[in-house]
Amino acid sequence: AHMDAKFRYGKSKQEIMEFIYDYLYVDDFAANSIYEYFVEQYTYAKIPSNQRLLIEYYKGFGDRRFVIFHSLFGRKVNDALSRAVAYIVARQYNTNVTISISDNGFYLSAEGTLGGLEAFKQLTPENFKNILTQSLNKTETLASRFRHCAGRSLMTLRHYKGEAKSVGRQQVRGKILLKFVQEMDNDFSILKEARREALEDYMDVNNALKVIELIANGQMEIKTINTIIPTPFAFNLVS
C-alpha cells in the first residue's frame, strides 16, 4: 500500500528510494532493483497490497488460461485460498485445475473456461472452512497428515515383530485405512485431527478466513486486469 500510494501521488525516485532504505535496510543496488521492479509493475498494471487483491487474467499458449491472484498474505494463506477457489472451479466447470502458489500470490490454470473471480466471490465467511475441508478429500496432503496421525495413535505400526515397515508400505496402508474411515465415519477423531493439521498447521485457515471477511466487509477491494503477457509480479509464478 505504501509503494502504490507513493507512485500515485507522484513521489520522486529519490523519495521512494529513501523509503526503501528506511523500510528494508538494503544497499544501493538492492534498493534500485526493488524500485525498478515496482516501477515496471505500476507502469504496466497495478500494484497489489494488503488493501487490494489484484486478479490478473492471462492466456497462455494454445487454449491454456491463467487466473493470477496477487495476494500478499504468505504461502500458507495462499495455499488455503487457492485450494478453495480451485475446488469451486473444478466442480462448476468440470475441469482439471492446476495450482501454483508463492508467498505473494497464486494462480489457477486450466484448458478452456476458467471463472476465477466468479469462483472466488462464492467464498463467504460462512462457507469457507467447509469448502476448504471438502477440497482436501482425495488429496495427498490429507493422506499424508492422516498417515502421521494414524501412526501416533497406533492405528498403523511402523515396526511389527521387530521388523520395520517401509515408507511405501506405510503410505499404501495409510490410504487404504483413510478410505475405510471416510466411508465408516466422517467425524472419526483421527480423521478430524488429520484435517485440523492440514488446515491449521500445513495451511493457515484462520488468517485466510480473515481475508475473506475483509473482502466481505468491503475493507479490501478486488481489481481485475487482462494482460497479453504476464505482469512483472506474475512472472515468477507462471514462468
Residue locations for each model-derived region?
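Extended, highly charged accessory segments
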Residues: 1-239
